[in-house]
From Swiss-Prot:
PR proteins are acid-soluble, protease-resistant proteins which accumulate in the intercellular spaces of many plants as a result of the hypersensitive reaction to a pathogen. PR-R exists as two isoforms in tobacco, a major and a minor form. Belongs to the thaumatin family. Gene3D superfamilies: Thaumatin. It is found in: Vacuole. It comes from the Eukaryota. GO terms for cellular component: vacuole. Disulfide bonds join C34-C225, C75-C85, C90-C96, C140-C214, C145-C197, C153-C163, C167-C176, C177-C184. Keywords: Disulfide bond, Pathogenesis-related protein, Plant defense, Signal, Vacuole. It holds the Pfam family Thaumatin. The lineage of its organism: Eukaryota, Viridiplantae, Streptophyta, Embryophyta, Tracheophyta. Coiled coil: none annotated. Residues 1-25 form the signal peptide. GO terms for biological process: defense response. This is Pathogenesis-related protein R minor form.
Length: 226
């Protein structure tokens, strides 16, 4: 997501303390409606095993940027919380301290920047689990990506448990936009994702149709397999 990665750090410093003082943390309710277990992950926030029907709530401070929530599949962890996941693995830890390994469907957000939240669903790291990302108290739109992407995934992007974004596999500017703003556009492979999930980012500079805003103070709900 281009905005969240490029939001100036000095602006974060200027506005962060002010909004921490006047705005409460946002609550994110994470719900697993899949028929299988999902190991939810959040940065910031950590991680939690969610069996079918279970939920987990986290509070995120205002001023937080470059944040994301995702689901991991087919995980095995020992009693100390060390192990691995087939998709979305975060350095073999149950309690994530960084981002997950593609492919993983992402709910991304930046809070109070400076007078609105920026939110999106991103497939820039690929797709593994259907997702809905919505406000719990109104004021902005629900975002969904629920198409059967894993089943329809192009052969060159298909991987165990998910569907890679072309940037993960091909790693050129055409797909990764590594040469800066305006250096890339949609491709046939990114259009595969966009046609099935029009709300979601399909490549790194897919900003205008994919980045949404909500009022500051909004609480959110992320649902796996809505």
């Amino acid at each position: 997501m281009n905005f969240l990665k490029s939001f100036p750090f000095y602006a974060f410093l200027c506005f962060g303390q002010y909004f921490v003082a006047v705005t409460h943390a946002a609550t994110f309710d994470i719900v697993n409606q899949c028929t299988y277990t999902v190991w939810a992950a959040a940065s910031p926030g950590g991680g939690r095993q969610l069996n079918s029907g279970q939920s987990w709530s986290i509070n995120v401070n205002p001023g937080t940027v470059q944040a994301r929530i995702w689901g991991r599949t087919n995980c095995n962890f020992d009693g100390s919380g060390r192990g691995n996941c087939e998709t979305g693995d975060c350095n073999g830890m149950l309690e994530c301290q960084g981002y997950g390994k593609p492919p993983n469907t992402l709910a991304e957000f930046a809070l109070n920047q400076p007078n609105q939240d920026f939110v999106d669903i991103s497939l820039v790291d690929g797709f593994n689990i259907p997702m809905e990302f919505s406000p719990t108290n109104g004021g902005c739109r629900n975002l969904r990506c629920t198409a059967p992407i894993n089943e329809q995934c192009p052969a060159q992007l298909k991987t165990q448990g998910g569907c890679n974004n072309p940037c993960t596999v091909i790693k050129t500017n055409e797909f990764c936009c590594t040469n800066g703003p305006g250096s890339c556009g949609p491709t046939d492979l990114s259009r595969f994702f966009k046609a099935r999930c029009p709300d979601a980012y399909s490549y790194p500079q897919d900003d205008p149709p994919s980045l949404f805003t909500c009022p500051p103070g909004t609480n959110y709900r992320v649902v796996f397999c809505p």
